[in-house]
Each structure stands twice: as C-alpha cells, then as structure tokens.
C-alpha cells in the first residue's frame, strides 16, 4: 500500500485534486469528512466541544453549529489549540480504522487540511500541496457564501504558505482554471504516483542518473524532507541522518540525486531498517554491502544501500556504522568540499571525466584514493569533528 499526503489551504483547490485522484483510482481518506463525522450528534467529540466552548455552539436540533464554533475557536491560538486538541486525536483514530480496512495494493490519498500543523508530513512517501494566491483563495471562498473577513481569518489561522511549501514533494499551482488543475493532477497520478506505488510494491529503485546538472538550491529542501521522512521511519535506530555528497555542496554541479547517510550502531541495526525504509519509499539495493576500502581492513567498510522508489526525486540512502571510516569520511568529504573551492573544481573535473567511462563510480576511485588522504590531512589541520 502507498499512502500519500494531500493538503492545501482553504480555497486552494485541494478538493478538486482529491476528486481527480479518486477518479484515477485512489482511495480517499478525507480529513474534512472525518472531522465532521467525529462531531456528529451523539458522539464523544461533540460532547467534548460543548464542554469546552458552551451549549451555544449547538443548533436547535442538537447538531453542531459550525459558524458559531468557528467564531469562538478561531479568535486566538489558545482557543484554536483547544479545538485541535479535541478533534485531531479523534480524526486520527478514525483515519487509521479506515486505512486498516483497505487492500494492500491500494493507493491511499490522505486528504489532511492541517498536515503541516499536525506534523504528519514525514509519515508519507509523497506529499502533494495545492497552492494558489491568497486573493484568489479569498475570492473562491466568498463565492461559496463565507464572509470575506471570516475567509481571511480562516486563512490566517492555517499554516503560512512557506511552511506548506517546505513539506511539499509536489507543489500543484492552482492559480489558473479548474481544468488546468485537473490535468496537472492526472499527469501527477499517472507519471509519478502510480510508478512510485509500483516500485514500492516491487521493492524496486528508480534508474540511476548519469548526467551532471547545474547546482540547484532546491536540493537542500528536498534533502530536508527526505531526512525527516527517514528519521520518522527509522526512529531511535538512526543515531543521526545527514545530507551528504555533491548535492550538499553549495554551488557545485552534480547528478540530480540526493545522497543521505544514516548512522547506526551496527550492520545488524542497518538490516533491521530494510523494511521500514522500503515502506517509506527507499528499497534496499541487495548486492551492495560495502564501500571501496581506503584502509587496509576491508571489514571496516561495510554498509547498506537503499535508493528512492520515487521517479520524481532520485536519492541514495547509505547506512553506515558509527565511527567507522566510511561513516566518518562521508561527513568529512562533504565539509571538505564546502570549505575548499579548489577541491570542488578538482572533483568536478574527475566527475566529468568519469562520465565518459563505462562505469562512473569505479572511474572516480583513483581520484578518491588521493582525496581520502588529503581530506583527513585537512581535518587534522582544522580540528574538524563529525
């Protein structure tokens, strides 16, 4: 099963994307629908809301008067936190009940308006955020019958746009027509979501990339999301998770592949992470179990390698043991390159040459043999520590 997160502010167009994904075959778990369900008359949720906000949030028939609740719950952060503290746990419990009943091959789209606020984004192998300019969103919401001041209050009460963008693996711009948004959503479903689902099911990585591209500042944002996703999947077994390699070096051309290192206590611990990482979208590459040794004892260079199943964000996830040469050098190498422009240029030349050879990684090894010695000399001189 693939679970993807879908979110967007009020009026952004999230419901249109959700409906499109449903038409494409996705199982929609709608946070708004569940939020209404858990506060229906006779529920524990409604009783808790009445206790917190008063009897005047009820209609004459005993149902929830949503505008009356909103007028109380969105006046300040404390009241909003009270509302969220009641509703969110109930929604989470009901959501899990629905997901547990879904078949294993399904693609589950979890439509969660407050995905940022709940901190749930790292739980998903893919997060889709729908966005639109605030003035466009206000206009849309007012057309639905909401007062403009209330619309602005609701928008301002939700996470700011920068925070939504930070969790987005995919950002769908809905500043155009509804038809344009539907087309974008369909394209995303068939060209990224379904291939990701197939790859996770088959425990299969996306093909390797062998082309240098100009430095992209978005690599750091992508890496931050992957790091958080991996930390969530690994829990305490990951002693640390770091963005390493060329995409972590500011200003340097690189393959469009984000490298991440997980530090663990032992290779046994690394093996225990195989299934959690695969479910998070990073299946294991079974045949790679060691780095190229740069010291006399090859046993010190054992590792595990996982790669991304997401065709839209290639990544390599290296798992190495704390304190061993491979783990230390991966951290050192990134810092050494960032601190030394001349070394960056040398390495870039070596990479460009390696791209002309049949085996890219092997072709770089002669350069790395000398780089290993030079990097540790720099570490000794500068007092570098991991």
Give the ranges of each region predicted by the language model.
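Helical scaffold of the NTase/Pol beta-like nucleotidyltransferase catalytic core
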Residues: 1-4, 186-242
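Walker A/P-loop
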Residues: 15
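ATP-dependent small-molecule kinase phosphotransfer cores
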Residues: 36-107
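ATP-dependent NMP and nucleoside kinases share a basic, alpha-helical "lid"
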Residues: 92-101, 107-143
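Small-molecule kinase domains that catalyze NTP-dependent phosphoryl transfer to phosphate-bearing small molecules
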Residues: 94-95, 121-123, 142-193
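Active-site nucleotide-donor binding segment shared across nucleotidyl transfer reactions
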Residues: 112-115, 227-271
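Metal-dependent nucleotidyltransferase catalytic core
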Residues: 136, 143-154, 216-230, 264-310
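Catalytic cores of NTP-dependent nucleotidyl/adenyl transfer enzymes across multiple folds
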Residues: 319, 323-386
